[in-house]
Amino acid sequence: MPGAHAILSPSASKRWMECPPSARREALMPEESSPYAVEGSLAHRIAEVMLTAYRDLDLLPMTADDLLQVEEGTVAADLRQLQQECSEAGLDYDSIAGTVHDGYVLLVYEEYQAFRRADKDTRLLVEARLNLKSFIPEGFGSSDAVIIGNDTVSVYDLKFGKGIKVDAVNNPQMMIYALGAVYGPADDYVVHDIRMTIVQPRLAWYSRFETTFEGLTHWGKYTLRPAAAKAFEGAGEYRPGPHCRFCRVASSCRVCEAYSRALRETFQDPSDLRDDELGYVLGQLDLLRGWAAKVETRAMDLLQQGKPVGGWKIVEGRSVRKISDQDAAIERLKAAGIDLDTVLKAPELKGLTDLEKVLRKSGLQTILGDLITKPQGKPTLAREDDPRPAMTPDVSKDFE
């Protein structure tokens, strides 16, 4: 649900169950956005429209393109709106819609139809709002899809990223969604079996975990509930580990820094590692890389705000020259009597380094000098003794 975030969100449950105090600190941090988050949000909205249309219109399976031609309901109009939003974000709607439809929507819909054949009262909930307060203080969340029927609750989670495969077995996020469904929309049903499925269509991967109503409830009461209470109060100990990789406060967390430093100091020379130690260190690399990236991002943010970071500054990064008007450049080269075969690499001009070899430096400047631009390099961190001048942060946008 855009705009609303629980202090103890299901998606971060592995983190706050492992490291309870991190939740309260993360709640004070601004939400981070990225192109990947925008893409993921659009993918989920496309999936929601498609799956809702299949359910409400009782459609036969078709293609993602065919759904744009459906005259009933608002599915075509809704998808065209999302098509426009993808275009504005520089994203390929056809690729996203086709992947989500074939890899996720049809899977859920076909399983829903199988449930209906066994139990005509089966329900399919799409983007189901779940009240989790029985187990998590002020807890709520949304499950991408929930099927309730045939004495079973089946919960689905679409993950559109293509980074790492996620296992559904004993996955706390999925178990929390299942608890929310069992003690919410399915509260009036007799439920024996619980099924949890993570679908990652871009990795052609899905993972499924099945348990019983009794097993899930026991975990909710005796594992989740006390862990959530501790995290909500900000109590417990900081406990670093692989879960730090996605923590927004990792860059300023002394415990995470100490853990990372201890790893580096313990295993300084890889050539001295035993095979079992090498395997352990490999398992920690994602954490170390993630922590280092967060530290760099935080330092960059502070310096761009004009705040000092001991021993560091922002300088202009490497920039590449380019020709601003390819057509005009080609016409000038023709007029200068240059053999175009020596300067063209279909369908455009060769790079400037290759052009310099043909025209020599002075010829390049004479013919094309005013068409050559060199944009400002991307800001990058550098030590204070770096010979490049420090960039002056533009803080004017803070007052707009």
Where do the model's predicted regions map?
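Charge-rich, acidic-biased intrinsically disordered regions
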Residues: 64-82, 243, 250, 300-327
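Alpha-helix N-cap/helix-initiation motif
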Residues: 32, 165-167, 274
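Nuclease catalytic cores
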Residues: 5-55, 279, 283, 311, ...
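Short, charged, low-complexity amphipathic alpha-helix
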Residues: 195, 218-287, 389-400
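Mg2+/Mn2+-dependent nuclease catalytic core
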Residues: 79, 86, 118-230
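Short, amphipathic alpha-helical segments that act as regulatory/interfacial helices
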Residues: 47-51, 178, 296
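A non-catalytic, helix-rich entry segment at domain boundaries
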Residues: 38, 42-126, 211
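Extended, charge-rich alpha-helical segments
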Residues: 290-400
